[in-house]
Curated annotation (Swiss-Prot):
One of its GO terms (biological process) is regulation of translational termination. The lineage of its organism: Bacteria, Pseudomonadati, Pseudomonadota, Gammaproteobacteria, Thiotrichales. The gene is prfC. NCBIfam families: prfC (TIGR00503), PRK00741.1 (NF001964), small_GTP (TIGR00231). Increases the formation of ribosomal termination complexes and stimulates activities of RF-1 and RF-2. It binds guanine nucleotides and has strong preference for UGA stop codons. It may interact directly with the ribosome. The stimulation of RF-1 and RF-2 is significantly reduced by GTP and GDP, but not by GMP. GO terms for molecular function: GTP binding; GTPase activity; guanosine tetraphosphate binding; translation release factor activity, codon nonspecific; translation release factor activity, codon specific. Transmembrane segments: none annotated. It holds the Pfam family EF-G_D2. It comes from Francisella tularensis subsp. mediasiatica (strain FSC147). Belongs to the TRAFAC class translation factor GTPase superfamily. Classic translation factor GTPase family. PrfC subfamily. This is Peptide chain release factor 3.
Amino acid sequence: MSEYLQQIAKRRTFAIISHPDAGKTTITEKMLLFGNAIKTAGTVKAKKSGIYATSDWMEMEKQRGISITTSVMQFPYNGRIINLLDTPGHEDFSEDTYRTLTAVDSALMVVDAVKGVEDRTIKLMNVCRLRDTPIVTFMNKFDRDTRDPLELLDEVENILKIKCAPMNWPIGMGKYFKGVYDLYNDEVTLFETGHGHEIYPYKKIKGLANAKDAIGIDLYEDLEMEIDLVRGASHEFDEQEFLEGNLTPVYFGTALSNFGVKEMMDGFTRYAPAPQHREADQRVVAADEQKLTGFVFKIQANMDEKHRNRIAFFRICSGKYEKGMKIFHERTGKQMQISKALTFMAGEREQVEEGYAGDIIGLHNHGSIQIGDSFTQGEKLKFKGIPNFAPEIFKRVKLNDPLKMKALQKGLVQLSEEGATQVFKPFISNDLVLGAVGVLQFDVVAQRLASEYNVKCSYEGVNVTLARWIFCSDEKKLNDFKKKYEVNLAYDGAGYLTYLAPTGVNLQLAQEKNPDIIFSATREH
């Protein structure tokens, strides 16, 4: 195998999906620890000590302990190159997370074993199922009193409609948690408390019978019965079914104590797929093609406090990036030279000399790159992506200093280009209406406007409950519609016509009266 093909085969690009507080940030830290990317893992709880989760680098994230922005972390493990896309963990940040799932080849689902399958996990799994993304599952928090593990497997199968294949099995739970039993290698790994910040060589005992004294006779007898039950009732691991997105290998442990994470990572790097082919409008692009192709799935403003720049997160789909190369920007039809692409470590940026399929690199962006843009080495090719989603909550922006209107508009357009929030300019007023998927996003925007653009603003209620993008191929009918409904119409930050409805009934009536107008809840980038 050539060096080029070896580099592609090494890549594992994935994201973690979970409900808030299921332990995603903690497990991210432990992975970075195993990959020698950080020296000690800072638990999210230790906010007062100034130890912050490495992936939570924006100021508000540090204060609240939540992962608002998607950062990208690359590190080596087991002879693989891991590209971990950190996804926003808090409930409010779903749209960014959805888009991130377009840039991965597999996903790790973290389930809080105390609570079971939760709402956010269901929504994220639905996005993964659209592309049949292979899923590995980690049942977390077994150092607490959790739900019954068999119940948890049933719940995953029934709610998420995916078969479960347990790879190991927990021995007890909470204060009686003794470790895990490897169902495929007949090996017990014994749990000890107090090793969450380090890589610790937990004791292993080969052969279940040899672990009887270490785990105690009562737990041993329970475990024997459970294992018989599990072997009879659950699915065996099948690699093909996993790669097709129909079956998930399940690992048990506790990320906070760094227990069970290594076993999961070993399994993940062994089974998760290398970079996969990608669908474009014109054709399917194979990962091992020689020419560089890729797409932008996120734009982040001001990752560097010293510079008011923007970084476009670019997923390489094929070919090799080399420093200084020229690429073709499909949307604008222009050539672009990339002299200083970046690789990321959650806010720490390094220039990258080369990149392969599966890698995420950062392109400096001075306003010309948008989410969903495709780049090639000359071919007219547009990758299919996940669109903008209509916001669900709306507020009017109230400016404290009217002289700062220009700075406010610039800041809001930049923030909307990141895809984290959306801004609308109504036809008949000078108002700026902000739309988001969740409430906390408004706090993020206000704080970033203050710290990055020196603009202080507050919010007022606005008589908008729904937004729909307007499309019509008949120019005359579209112009008539604009005149008739100008009180409800606005342009979004990218200049697309949008209908802002005060009520669901209002929207329904407008749709019924205008059958030739398309009212869309999504907009392709």
